[in-house]
Amino acid sequence: MKLEMICTGEEVLSGQIVDTNAAWVANTLMELGIEMQHRVTVGDRMDDLVAAFQERSKHADVIIVNGGLGPTSDDMSALAMAKAKGEELVENVQWREHLEDWFTRNNRVMAKSNLKQAWLPASAVMVDNPVGTACGFRVKLNNAWLFFTPGVPFELKHMVTEQFIPFITEEFGVQEKSALEKLLTIGHGESSLADTLSEITLPAGIELGYRSSMPHIEIKIFARGDKAIRQLPDVTKQVKALLGCAVVAENRPTLAAEIHHRLYQSGFSLSVAESCTGGMITSQLIDFAGSSSYLHHGLVTYSNESKVKVLGVNPQILDDHGAVSIPTVEAMAQGVRGILDSDFALATSGIAGPDGGSDDKPVGTVAIALATKHGVYSQMVKLPKRSRQLVRSMSTAIAYDMLRRALLEEAVIVDYPSIPRFAK
């Protein structure tokens, strides 16, 4: 089966919005062993849409078309498909009734323009969208089934999961069995990871892939076929052995997700005092439901005054060592932990840039501490100074990893290949 995708919308083509829909579709299908082989983005121009449908349908078996199903004048997908096939639009009575019922149930007055969403190409097969008003549909043109999906991400994901995947499974048969392991790493560059893992002789049917999303690089170990699937655990073990402490999570989308899972399951509590990370450590945990069960509080103590008055940092420490120092973050971590007697506390203080650095403490210098009921662990690292966001996100990742390792009762301070650490 040859799978392609046509993404529509002037705002996507011009870069006004990032096309996360296409990335999600490709990744979701890839994890099922279904590879996207071609993708094109087309603006809101009728001739271009018609040409894209006609041309790509000669090469693909199935095409996901995303966007352009709404009620406004720039939503052209249904009409463009009808023109591409040389047929009329006809009203789908079932969907018109769905629209009328949807607006009634939600106590809203339906603008007449919404009825446009019920007009589909004459040969179209309606695809249900129970979570929205844009009607999905599929049409056969030349060699391909074109499967039209809404641009709203929540609606798209629902339709792909509930409608598209079952359709292609039935239409094209079950794909070869596949399995996937994902390892999240920090402290390595992508090329460094590839060089390190080149030592492994991969069995037939197993492939390695890399996805950089700083501060993490995700390694995907993909196995296709029964024999490769049986060999997958051994290959995963080899990868982890070679990378050592660089692997910080398995089959989790982010390190924050790993920390949330471990804290939620453990019953331990956490408090956070942040300076250079500015609430990032706390915010990423709050994204997860249930974080209130372990997160006591997160404080952004950016100024020296707040470090002293809120956290109880001795002013002499700041005078002697400065805000970006191991003694300061240790005092911050101990102070915030003591407020509510939390099991763990994290603290950060650093120079995110672009200004503020010195010869002794250049931009990218960050001090991080973890306080427990048994002691304090701390380190000061030198991070890449490409942007404030990168310094903050990498600081957050290192802080999370210190906590993760403490929860696992492993060494809290470890060496990362590409992150130098200052001597204490």
From Swiss-Prot:
Q: Which InterPro entries match?
A: CinA, CinA-like_C, CinA_C, Competence-induced_CinA, MoaB/Mog-like_dom_sf, MoaB/Mog_dom
Q: Which CDD domains match?
A: cinA
* Taxonomic superkingdom: Bacteria
Kindly give the PANTHER family that the UniProt entry links to this protein. Answer: NICOTINAMIDE-NUCLEOTIDE AMIDOHYDROLASE PNCC, NMN AMIDOHYDROLASE-LIKE PROTEIN YFAY
Query: Which family is it part of?
Result: Belongs to the CinA family.
Q: What is this protein called?
A: CinA-like protein
